[in-house]
UniProtKB/Swiss-Prot annotation:
One of its GO terms (cellular component) is cytosolic small ribosomal subunit. One of its GO terms (biological process) is translation. GO terms for molecular function: rRNA binding; structural constituent of ribosome. Keywords: Ribonucleoprotein, Ribosomal protein, RNA-binding, rRNA-binding. It comes from the Bacteria. It comes from Bdellovibrio bacteriovorus (strain ATCC 15356 / DSM 50701 / NCIMB 9529 / HD100). The keyword RNA-binding applies. This is Small ribosomal subunit protein uS15.
Amino acid sequence: MAVTKDQTSQIVKKFKTSDLDTGSSEVQIALLTAKINDLTNHFAKHKKDHHGRRGLVTMVNKRRKLLDYLHRKDVKKYQDLIKALDIRK
């Protein structure tokens, strides 16, 4: 199942940097992570969904680019976000 509006609004509230923030790198990365986790669970059941897997790879690449950007701009925010989302081991 896709990420719902309620889940999206909760993620935005948790990771926003200002009151009107919906598009900062942190928020975008958190939303992509939620979608990636959701699709990963989907592929555990639907192994042959190759069209969906292509979308997953696209999301992972976009998240990687945003993480690289955040790492270049602010290492502290990058490290905090990685810990909060539990992305890196």
